[in-house]
Swiss-Prot record:
Entry keyword set: DNA-binding, Metal-binding, Nucleus, Repeat, Transcription, Transcription regulation, Zinc, Zinc-finger
Source organism (scientific name): Gorilla gorilla gorilla
Domain of life: Eukaryota
GO BP: regulation of transcription by RNA polymerase II
Family per record: Belongs to the krueppel C2H2-type zinc-finger protein family.
Protein name: Zinc finger protein 80
Length: 273
């Protein structure tokens, strides 16, 4: 691990830049009297040090110097395994756990271990049942902030993940990854019985049923069989008359989500929900 770059792009250069600053006790604000393209970046403000790039204030020179490495592009800590570099030692140490396999954060409930404390804290919500993120649009709650953000996009119509090949956009990165297989031709799922390959696991699973038990989920009312339990659940509504999807605009209910989504597109101006 060694500082990179030269001039102001090094740790020594940054220290020199700050230490050249001469400030009397009566000065409220003083610009660094240093040489180089970034000479106005660091200023002394009373007993604090302020970064002129972003306005962040520090109470020590050393903290300001370390912070300025972000603006200067200096990454002091470099991983010898993969070459990735970091501004902060704490980030470097955390990254090294990926290579070492170290997982120091342990769940006291079940013993599962993690390499980051933040991952452990998120995981513990499985045991506590805590769902701190609530959607203001529909009231649905979520354990994880990332899932909450993705859900919120279904209300705004925003789709952050775009395919560079065809421009199609998606709410979820996993959906984009799945879609990309269409362009790459990747078929990672291979049937052990006949050797046929498939792009999607769902299609592969459905195919594998033809070699084994067929359709394991059977309707008790009419005897129709299904590959998946959710397909049987959806079919059962044709017998029970259950309609769990309700359009709040017209108070109309639907037995199937596809019909509900089609109705919702009318109200949302054609945006997929």
């Amino acid at each position: 691990m060694s500082p990179k770059g030269d001039g102001l792009g090094t740790v020594d250069g940054l220290h020199s830049q700050v230490l050249q600053e001469q400030v009397s006790t009566g000065d409220n604000l003083h610009e660094c009297d240093s040489q180089g393209p970034s000479k106005d970046t660091l200023v002394r403000e009373g007993k604090t040090y302020k970064c002129k790039e972003c306005g962040k204030v520090f109470n020590k020179n050393s903290l300001l110097v370390r912070h300025h490495q972000i603006h200067a592009g200096v990454k002091t800590y470099e991983c010898q395994e993969c070459g990735k570099a970091f501004h902060e030692k704490v980030d470097f140490v955390r990254h090294m756990r990926i290579h070492s396999g170290e997982k120091p954060c342990k769940c006291v409930e079940c013993g599962k271990v993690f390499n980051r404390r933040s991952h452990l804290l998120c995981y513990r919500q499985i045991h506590t049942g805590e769902k701190p993120y609530e959607c203001s649009e529909c009231g649905k709650t979520f354990s994880y902030h990332s899932v909450f953000i993705q859900h919120r996009m279904t209300h705004t119509g925003e789709k952050l993940f775009g395919c560079k090949e065809c421009g199609k956009t998606f709410y979820y990165n996993s959906s984009l990854t799945r879609h990309m297989k269409i362009h790459t031709g990747e078929k990672p799922y291979k049937c052990g019985e006949c050797g046929k390959t498939f792009t999607y696991h769902s299609v592969f699973f459905r195919h594998s049923m033809t070699h084994t038990a067929g359709k394991p989920y059977e309707c008790k009312e009419c005897g129709k069989g299904f590959y998946y339990s959710y397909s049987l659940t959806r079919h059962t509504r044709s017998h029970t008359g259950e309609k769990p999807y309700e359009c709040l605009e017209h108070r109309k209910a639907f037995g199937y989500h596809s019909a509900f989504a089609q109705q919702s597109k009318i109200h949302s101006g054609g945006k997929n929900l």
